């Protein structure tokens, strides 16, 4: 089997994780107590969903995941929630003391006390796999735990499981909506390690997802549950080909191969279509061409950045439901003729498509309508640099006055780490600039430079 272990870190990671496992269970017909009436091979078997669930002799299906947090309140919600019987108690690891929105606490003082326990649990899960494919890591980089403990854990995973791929689903701070004053510090420090220790990182931001909920689902005041259920649909579409047998299957490592032209340029934009409420869906039939176009709309992007300001390097389209390759090819051909969607000149084809015949599932009583077909797009665009330049700008404003820095230094960090991380991001912005530059003109100029 090609198993995948999911790691959910900090409040955002755990709450997105809850939404994901809720959706996976519905998709596979697994009950909240882990029993799966439709499963004929009790106690093992080589079913496709075993990539995400392990089976006990008693026929119980246990998610291959760990939930980590430095304080107990969020994990306690899992311990008492609907799916409390689904998880093994050892998979839910919580500390007693919060990271207090401080990267240094999550990474140095409090984080390092808990990280060995986490790695121990992950080792147990890994030993339970026959052919571990990689890790999905869910965290946010604005807070203290997601950024600090998240990057610490990624660094340690690189040491222990060097060759395994690591996909990150990372919630970045939004341009307008902020939950902490020190978000820019935490994000810059954390991205510094995401750069080195993840293979693909899908960027999400709450504001963009809020806007999608408000605009497309007519929810006036979206809650985190609304946001997370939408994010869960994206993640479910990405992992569908690992969990179901499909026509055009896509492996975790395949994302890497097709989306990452240079190791550092691995921050992805994602979008999902159709995001549509039940009332509207009743009156519309959405064709493959329509949902494909809508996935490329700037308003559908799950991070606040405008793909029209950049160029696409590569793009992965994961269809599910009633979709045939002929429709996909036609839709992609149409996209290629659009002037607004520009590719870099050194990557002319740029599309990777996957199809999975399992139609999208929706959470009963949720906001999304049940549809026949859906598409999820993950794209590598130079426009994502906007997100970094926004963060860097906010970082610079605070760091120029050394505001709040003493909280980090007091937890054993050195001031040099701030400037090191900031320089790394400056280099990243420059990398994106160069990648998007026209290669034909560039050839003449840089003959003098040595590589």
UniProtKB/Swiss-Prot annotation:
Posttranslational mods: Undergoes a tyrosination/detyrosination cycle, the cyclic removal and re-addition of a C-terminal tyrosine residue by the enzymes tubulin tyrosine carboxypeptidase (TTCP) and tubulin tyrosine ligase (TTL), respectively. Acetylation of alpha chains at Lys-40 stabilizes microtubules and affects affinity and processivity of microtubule motors. This modification has a role in multiple cellular functions, ranging from cell motility, cell cycle progression or cell differentiation to intracellular trafficking and signaling.
Single Gene Ontology MF annotation: hydrolase activity
Catalytic activity as recorded in UniProt: GTP + H2O = GDP + phosphate + H(+)
Domain of life: Eukaryota
Catalytic center residues: 254
Residues annotated as site: Involved in polymerization: 451
Gene Ontology CC: cytoplasm; microtubule
Family matches, as Gene3D superfamilies: Helix hairpin bin (1.10.287.600), Tubulin/FtsZ, C-terminal domain (3.30.1330.20), Tubulin/FtsZ, GTPase domain (3.40.50.1440)
Known cofactor(s): Mg(2+)
EC numbers for this chain: 3.6.5.-
GO BP: microtubule-based process
N6-acetyllysine: residues bearing it: 40
InterPro entries: Alpha_tubulin (IPR002452), Tub_FtsZ_C (IPR008280), Tubulin (IPR000217), Tubulin/FtsZ-like_C (IPR037103), Tubulin/FtsZ_2-layer-sand-dom (IPR018316), Tubulin/FtsZ_GTPase_sf (IPR036525), Tubulin_C (IPR023123), Tubulin_CS (IPR017975)
Binding site for GTP: 11, 71, 144-145, 179, 206, 228
Subcellular location: Cytoplasm, Cytoskeleton
UniProt binding sites for Mg(2+): 71
Alphabetical keyword list: Acetylation, Cytoplasm, Cytoskeleton, GTP-binding, Hydrolase, Magnesium, Metal-binding, Microtubule, Nucleotide-binding
PANTHER family attached to this UniProt entry: TUBULIN
Function statement: Tubulin is the major constituent of microtubules, a cylinder consisting of laterally associated linear protofilaments composed of alpha- and beta-tubulin heterodimers. Microtubules grow by the addition of GTP-tubulin dimers to the microtubule end, where a stabilizing cap forms. Below the cap, tubulin dimers are in GDP-bound state, owing to GTPase activity of alpha-tubulin.
Subunit structure: Dimer of alpha and beta chains. A typical microtubule is a hollow water-filled tube with an outer diameter of 25 nm and an inner diameter of 15 nM. Alpha-beta heterodimers associate head-to-tail to form protofilaments running lengthwise along the microtubule wall with the beta-tubulin subunit facing the microtubule plus end conferring a structural polarity. Microtubules usually have 13 protofilaments but different protofilament numbers can be found in some organisms and specialized cells.
Family, as annotated: Belongs to the tubulin family.
Name of this protein: Tubulin alpha chain
Organism: Chlorella vulgaris
């Amino acid at each position: 089997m090609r198993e995948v272990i999911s790691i959910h870190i900090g409040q955002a990671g755990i709450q997105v994780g809850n939404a994901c496992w809720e959706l996976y269970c519905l998709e596979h017909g697994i009950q909240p107590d882990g029993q799966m009436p439709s499963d004929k091979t009790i106690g093992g078997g080589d079913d496709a969903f075993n990539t995400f669930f392990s089976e006990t002799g008693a026929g119980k299906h246990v998610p291959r995941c760990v939930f980590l947090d430095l304080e107990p309140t969020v994990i306690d919600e899992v311990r008492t929630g609907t799916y409390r019987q689904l998880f093994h108690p050892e998979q839910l690891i919580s500390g007693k003391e919060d990271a207090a929105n401080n990267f240094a606490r999550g990474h140095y003082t409090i984080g390092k006390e808990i990280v060995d326990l986490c790695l121990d649990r992950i080792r147990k899960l890994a030993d339970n796999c026959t052919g571990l494919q990689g890790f999905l890591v869910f965290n946010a980089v604005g807070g203290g735990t997601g950024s600090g403990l998240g990057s610490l854990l990624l660094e340690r995973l690189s040491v222990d499981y060097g060759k395994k791929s690591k996909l990150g689903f990372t919630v970045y701070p939004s341009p307008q909506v902020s939950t902490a004053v020190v978000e820019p510090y935490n994000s810059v420090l954390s991205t510094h390690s995401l750069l080195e220790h993840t293979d693909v990182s899908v960027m999400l931001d709450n504001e963009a997802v809020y806007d999608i909920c408000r605009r497309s689902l007519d929810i006036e005041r979206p809650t985190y549950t609304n946001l997370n259920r939408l994010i869960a649909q994206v993640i479910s579409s990405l992992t569908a080909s690992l969990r179901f047998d499909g026509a055009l299957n896509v492996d975790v490592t395949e994302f890497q191969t097709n989306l990452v032209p240079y190791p550092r340029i691995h921050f992805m934009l994602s979008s999902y279509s159709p995001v549509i409420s039940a009332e509207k869906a009743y009156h519309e039939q959405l064709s493959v061409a329509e949902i494909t176009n809508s996935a490329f709309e700037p308003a559908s992007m799950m991070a606040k950045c405008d793909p029209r300001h950049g160029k696409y390097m590569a793009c992965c389209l994961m269809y599910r439901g009633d979709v045939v390759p002929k429709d996909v090819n036609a839709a992609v051909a149409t996209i290629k003729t659009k002037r607004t969607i520009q590719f870099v000149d050194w990557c002319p084809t740029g599309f990777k498509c996957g199809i999975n015949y399992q139609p999208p599932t929706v959470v009963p009583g949720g906001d999304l309508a049940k549809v026949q077909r859906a598409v999820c797009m993950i794209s590598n665009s130079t426009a994502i640099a906007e997100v970094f330049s926004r963060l860097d700008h906010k970082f610079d404003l605070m760091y120029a006055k050394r505001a709040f820095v003493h909280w980090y230094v007091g937890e054993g960090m050195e001031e040099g780490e701030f400037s090191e991380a900031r320089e790394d991001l400056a280099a990243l912005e420059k990398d994106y600039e160069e990648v998007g530059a026209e290669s034909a003109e560039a050839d003449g100029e840089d003959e003098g430079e040595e590589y």
